[in-house]
From Swiss-Prot:
UniProt name for this protein: Conotoxin Cal6.35
Cystine crosslinks: 43-53, 46-59, 52-66
Protein keywords: Disulfide bond, Knottin, Neurotoxin, Secreted, Signal, Toxin
Notes concerning its domains: The cysteine framework is VI/VII (C-C-CC-C-C).
Record localization: Secreted
Organism ancestry: Eukaryota, Metazoa, Spiralia, Lophotrochozoa, Mollusca
Length: 67
């Protein structure tokens, strides 16, 4: 019984670590696309529920189409 509990806890911890690592990787990819690491980007400041339309150099709602 103790071994089962230990295994369940270990699986939960490993799953949580994978989720955290995936979130960090996704955030890093978004940051690179937005130019936070030295890359030139016209809308590095575009955050939240907004998206960057590089061609028009505008930051607008994710629900709007890029011009």
């Amino acid at each position: 019984m103790k071994l089962t509990c230990v295994l369940i806890v270990a699986v939960l911890i490993l799953t949580a670590c994978q989720v955290i690592a995936a979130d960090e990787a996704e955030a890093t990819n978004r940051a690179i696309k937005r130019g936070w690491f030295g890359e030139e980007s016209s809308c590095w400041w575009c955050t939240g529920f907004n998206k960057c339309c590089e061609a028009a150099a505008v930051c607008q709602s994710v629900n709007s189409a890029c011009p």
